[in-house]
A protein has these predicted regions:
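Amphipathic alpha-helical segments in structured regions that serve as interaction surfaces
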Residues: 3-20, 24-63, 68-83
């Protein structure tokens, strides 16, 4: 299972709210790009996958210079810190 549509919409909304100059298509594209990066990690646990996605969207929405890869890495580090 990939990222649920509900979470994709929430993630795209977080990005769009912080960058109103972006079109909704661009915000959705950014969210889908983050979802693809997470898919490449092969995370099997759905809760982890979805949580990392939302965190990565929030990181991107706070720092437009943050690459999708770095946002996902940062979200995964945060997951590991909280999980420890």
């Amino acid at each position: 299972m990939g990222i649920p549509q509900k979470s994709l919409v929430i993630g795209a909304c977080a990005i769009a709210c912080h960058y109103p100059e972006l079109s909704l298509n661009d915000a959705a594209g950014d969210a889908l790009q983050l979802a693809e990066k997470i898919r490449l990690y092969g995370i099997e646990e759905n809760q982890k996958k979805e949580t990392v996605f939302i965190a990565a969207c929030r990181f991107v929405s706070a720092d437009k210079d943050l690459t999708p890869q770095k946002a996902v890495e940062k979200a995964l580090r945060l997951w590991d810190i909280i999980e420890a």
